[in-house]
């Protein structure tokens, strides 16, 4: 494991105080990637030349005290089912092995405007269908804590690069746990935002009514910073909404704990950790109340009806595409 990378706020402080340059940080994470990738295979492609160029532009902004904000100069990795103009988006599939994106996903546009530096595209289970990142056409990703273990999936590459220190943060996509589960396996923070709060424009769909793009980071505060940058209404996504957030400050709030998620099937260790947080919140004066959603037990069954139906419809559009497969290969497949 590489030396732990500071939080985004701390990095920004180092930049502002001229104690570190964005180009130095980029070189650091690239060096980490260069000696971990042979084992982990978390990045499918690294953007060294472009990243170094943009990081030096960020250097100049900080020198002139004209930084674009907290994310200016921060190296972030992007899951390879999210489009970046001019780069391949393969979804870890041979079907899209030659597809070069002609446009940016909305989240990518937002991060570019914030001065983010992209480290590269990360590995995933093919078309984001899987939970181990073993089912990639380009080979499996390993867990940075122990290469004999899987990193989870489908955003296993995005979780692994953050855990290994070859990116400060990353974006993944989550349909039924594909950000949260690999983040847990790799010991980092994964967040699936509320559906509609982050635009899906430019995300190659798995199940359109369940997919959501979200951040994987080292800290909860880093997650907040990235989410604030990528959230918001987008006219290019018909399911996009305008989020309404309430600033809590030090207000006392009422918090529900879902009874059905604190029962059989949830490990004692997990329940104990949740209970520690519950006790802390109570000590702070918040009202923590047990609530019940009886239909929770049906959620997995409903997921396995919706997800296969929608992914079948979404993936059928690639059947006659010439994005990747040469005619000779197509003849072999027929």
Language-model-derived ranges and their functions:
Residues 22-27, 56-59, 267-293, 325-329:
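Acyltransferase
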Residues 51-53, 61-136:
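Acidic/His- and Gly-rich active-site-bordering loop/insert found
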Residues 71-91, 250-258, 306-334:
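Short helix-loop capping/hinge segments that flank enzyme active sites or metal/cofactor-binding pockets
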Residues 103-105, 109-230:
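Short glycine/serine-rich loop segments
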Residues 192-272, 330-334:
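A short helix-breaking turn/cap at a secondary-structure junction
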């Amino acid at each position: 494991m590489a030396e732990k990378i500071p939080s985004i706020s701390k990095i920004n402080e180092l930049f502002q105080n001229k104690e570190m340059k964005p180009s130095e940080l980029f070189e650091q994470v690239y060096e980490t990637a260069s000696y971990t990738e042979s084992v982990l295979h978390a990045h499918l492609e690294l953007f060294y030349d472009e990243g170094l160029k943009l990081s030096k532009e960020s250097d100049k902004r900080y020198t002139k005290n004209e930084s674009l904000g907290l994310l200016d100069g921060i190296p972030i990795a992007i899951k390879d089912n999210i489009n970046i103009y001019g780069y391949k988006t393969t979804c870890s599939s041979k079907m899209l092995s030659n597809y070069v994106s002609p446009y940016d996903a909305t989240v990518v546009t937002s991060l570019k405007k914030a001065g983010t530096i992209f480290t590269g595209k990360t590995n995933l289970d093919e078309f984001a269908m899987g939970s181990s990142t073993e089912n990639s056409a380009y080979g499996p990703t390993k867990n940075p804590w122990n290469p004999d273990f899987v990193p989870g999936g489908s955003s296993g590459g995005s979780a692994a690069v953050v855990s290994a220190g070859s990116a400060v943060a990353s974006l993944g996509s989550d349909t039924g746990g594909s950000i949260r589960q690999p983040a847990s396996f790799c010991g980092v923070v994964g967040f699936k935002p509320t559906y509609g709060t982050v635009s899906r424009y430019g995300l190659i769909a798995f199940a359109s009514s369940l997919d959501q793009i979200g951040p994987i980071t080292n800290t909860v505060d880093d997650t907040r910073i990235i989410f604030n940058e990528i959230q918001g209404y987008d006219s290019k996504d018909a399911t996009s909404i305008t989020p309404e957030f309430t600033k809590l400050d030090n207000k006392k709030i009422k918090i529900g704990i879902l009874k059905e998620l604190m029962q059989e099937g949830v490990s004692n260790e997990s329940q104990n950790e949740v209970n520690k947080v519950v006790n802390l919140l109570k000590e702070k004066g918040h009202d923590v109340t047990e609530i019940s959603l009886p239909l929770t037990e049906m959620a997995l069954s409903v997921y396995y009806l919706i997800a296969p139906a929608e992914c079948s419809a979404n993936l059928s559009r690639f059947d006659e595409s010439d994005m990747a497969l040469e005619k000779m290969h197509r003849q072999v497949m027929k």
